[in-house]
């Protein structure tokens, strides 16, 4: 009888039921990344979705239905760009923008404004092994120096948990 919001990993088979475009957005090639833990897969095909459900009641407060919706976070830059704008306000240091934001699905960058050596969003790159161990394995926030794609940064990472409390990713 209450509204529920959660972040969940959605299998490709479920994304396909909603539309080919969602499954295509979720599919990411994994890019070899310096200092990342070994990973045998060369791609990710499941998606991370922010989902919500709210009861619909009649005049007698009886639940007669549910409003349900979700937003696929893979390749969706609205959240990371908005957070960057709010927190870092376009500040620069030595001509370079400071502050970056990433949503990780497990250890994989699925939404980010971190850029690679070509100046493109570093989608498909991975987190460093030491951050992986702290945040994804031990479930602890990380605050400190970390290697991000191709540079050292002062960073903060927080686990993203699904509705059951399982760690499914990170916010950087």
Annotate each PLM feature:
Residues 8-10, 93-96, 100-108:
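Short hydrophobic alpha-helical segments used for membrane anchoring or interfacial signaling
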Residues 43-45, 63, 95, 149:
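Solvent-exposed loop and beta-edge segments used for protein-protein assembly and interaction
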Residues 44-62, 69, 100-115, 136-142:
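A short, hydrophobic secondary-structure junction motif
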Residues 47-84, 152-172:
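Conserved beta-strands of PAS-like sensory domains
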Residues 1-42, 74-90, 111-150, 161:
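Extracytoplasmic/periplasmic sensor domains and loops in membrane signaling proteins
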Residues 6, 47, 70, 99, ...:
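Glycine-centered flexibility motif
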């Amino acid at each position: 009888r209450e509204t529920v919001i959660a972040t969940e990993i959605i299998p490709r088979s479920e994304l396909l039921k909603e539309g080919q475009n969602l499954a295509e957005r979720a599919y990411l090639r994994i890019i070899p990344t310096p200092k990342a833990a070994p990973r045998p897969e060369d791609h990710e095909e499941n998606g991370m979705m922010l989902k919500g459900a709210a009861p619909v009641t009649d005049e007698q407060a009886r639940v007669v239905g549910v409003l349900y919706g979700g937003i696929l976070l893979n390749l969706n830059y609205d959240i990371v760009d908005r957070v960057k704008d709010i927190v870092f306000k376009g500040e620069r240091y030595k001509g370079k923008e400071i502050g970056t934001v990433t949503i990780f699905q497990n250890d994989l960058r699925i939404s980010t404004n971190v850029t690679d050596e070509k100046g493109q969003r570093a989608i498909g790159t991975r987190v460093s092994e030491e951050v992986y161990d702290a945040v994804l394995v031990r479930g602890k926030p990380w605050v400190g120096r970390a290697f991000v794609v191709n540079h050292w940064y002062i960073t903060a990472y927080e686990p993203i948990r699904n509705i059951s409390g399982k760690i499914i990713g990170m916010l950087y």
